[in-house]
Curated annotation (Swiss-Prot):
Its cofactor is a divalent metal cation. It comes from Thermoplasma acidophilum (strain ATCC 25905 / DSM 1728 / JCM 9062 / NBRC 15155 / AMRC-C165). NAD(+) binds at residues 62-63, 67, 129-130, 140, 157, 159, 167, 170-175, 194, 229. The lineage of its organism: Archaea, Methanobacteriati, Thermoplasmatota, Thermoplasmata, Thermoplasmatales. Involved in the regulation of the intracellular balance of NAD and NADP, and is a key enzyme in the biosynthesis of NADP. Catalyzes specifically the phosphorylation on 2'-hydroxyl of the adenosine moiety of NAD to yield NADP. It comes from the Archaea. It is found in: Cytoplasm. One of its GO terms (cellular component) is cytoplasm. This is NAD kinase. InterPro entries: ATP-NAD_kinase_N, ATP-NAD_kinase_PpnK-typ_C, NAD/diacylglycerol_kinase_sf, NADK. Gene3D superfamilies: Probable inorganic polyphosphate/atp-NAD kinase, domain 1, Probable inorganic polyphosphate/atp-NAD kinase, domain 2. The keyword Cell division does not apply.
Amino acid sequence: MKIAFVIRKDCSRCARIAESIIDLLPKDWEIIYDHEAAKFLNSKGLDISQISADVIITIGGDGTVLRTLQMAKGPVLGINMGGLGFLTELEVDEVGSAIFKLIKGQYRITESMKLKVEINGDRVEDCTNEAVVHTERIARIRQFKIYIDGHFLSTMKSDGIIVATPIGSSSYSSSAGGPLLLPTLKGMVISYLAPYSSRLKPVVVTSDSTVEIKIAGRDQECILILDGQREYTVRSGDTVRISRSENSARFLSFRESVYDRIRDKVIKHVVN
């Protein structure tokens, strides 16, 4: 078994947790690290893009998970050192018992859809949570034209548009008023940031749909943001095309069902 560790930048506590996990793993398992973990553990590290493993253990928050899913190859087991940590599987106090389950093979691998993103036909990185087209500055409303499967949907004014996967619907899209989609669903949700008209409501489309966002108006500049990680400048006349990717995000899970994650990561936090 080959295990990789990816940790949050400049997090010495994350490195100590990685070290404690390594002490629990069988001695014949191969261990590799990203540069950040290696820096604290006095070992040789790899760029995340070079990491390929049977299990990739991330220690940090959702940002660490998303960065890993974007570049590394292998199912991710996330340990939460951040806030809500919807994409993470474990809290720190659950690590010990979970590692014993990992050693015994008592886990399952789940898959979630990713989004394929193109700018004027040129493909950029896939994303796991959402693609956001946003104005270049806060509170600068812009005009967008939205097409679904080549059919014109609407011209709208807003601060931006979010296209999210089911697993990403609990994140930025949710804060913009979008619905929560179960991760088992195959679809995308289109939601709006500060729309000019309150009558504009989020739209859910099937996963085999293609969503196109055209930057309308004259001399307009916006930013395309993927998973809060990568940014691209788009301008008037440019088209951002979003569809389901042939790639998927893989997670290692000890939970019996997806509903456990919804309950533990979303509902409990809302109720409490």
